[in-house]
């Protein structure tokens, strides 16, 4: 894997400080600045901002809301992500960011606009992991959206050095509004859709390291 799969797999790995265990969802620019300074003092290479930085109509102050609305929260981060990348540069560390673009909370602008983009089973009680649903990546429009999440972040903040791409829910409520009569194709077409998005991201940002994790690990 190091030789053939990882980017520069035989090279050194960056060490990082993640804010999650310190702040969880409760942070602002000043708290993050202190953590960046402490990361430098510890000799860490990079500071990574985890979950909770996005959502305005449905702020990401807990795991009940906000997934799908990938705009910086104006209360926590009034100056946006770009101010954090500058802050990290001043502190002498690189900056990384958490995303989970395959997922959506029902309490989000995205879900209210496109409920058919989520994998849900009509006529049955909806089953949630971490209060969220999986977006239907068998749908090309959803693939375009998920790619655009990463593309918009990187276009607006080209100094981001690392993405932590999380996945906190398996596929539940198995049904695709897009596939209609081809429900047996959902698992395969969904995975192919994920691979397509990853390929597009990798082709446009070939030097961007990404950690693909599940449940934070």
Model-derived features: where do they sit?
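Short glycine/proline-rich turn/loop motifs
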Residues: 14-20, 127-132
């Amino acid at each position: 894997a190091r030789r053939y799969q990882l980017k520069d797999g035989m090279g050194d790995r960056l060490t990082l400080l993640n804010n999650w265990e310190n702040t969880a969802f409760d942070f602002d620019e000043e708290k993050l600045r202190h953590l960046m300074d402490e990361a430098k003092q510890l000799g860490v290479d990079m500071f990574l901002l985890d979950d909770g930085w996005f959502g305005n109509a449905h702020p990401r102050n807990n795991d009940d809301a906000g997934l799908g609305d990938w705009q910086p929260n104006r209360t926590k981060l009034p100056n946006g992500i770009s101010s954090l990348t500058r802050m990290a540069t001043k502190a002498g560390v690189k900056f990384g960011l958490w995303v989970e673009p395959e997922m959506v909370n029902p309490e989000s602008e995205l879900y209210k606009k496109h409920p058919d983009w989520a994998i849900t089973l009509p006529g049955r009680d909806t089953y949630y992991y971490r209060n969220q649903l999986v977006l239907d990546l068998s749908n090309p429009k959803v693939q375009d959206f998920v790619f655009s999440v990463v593309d918009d972040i990187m276009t607006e903040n080209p100094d981001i050095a690392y993405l932590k791409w999380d996945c906190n829910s398996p596929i539940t409520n198995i049904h695709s509004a897009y596939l209609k009569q081809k429900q047996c194709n959902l698992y395969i077409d969904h995975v192919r859709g994920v691979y397509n998005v990853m390929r597009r991201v990798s082709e446009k940002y070939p030097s961007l390291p990404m950690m693909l994790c599940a449940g934070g690990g």
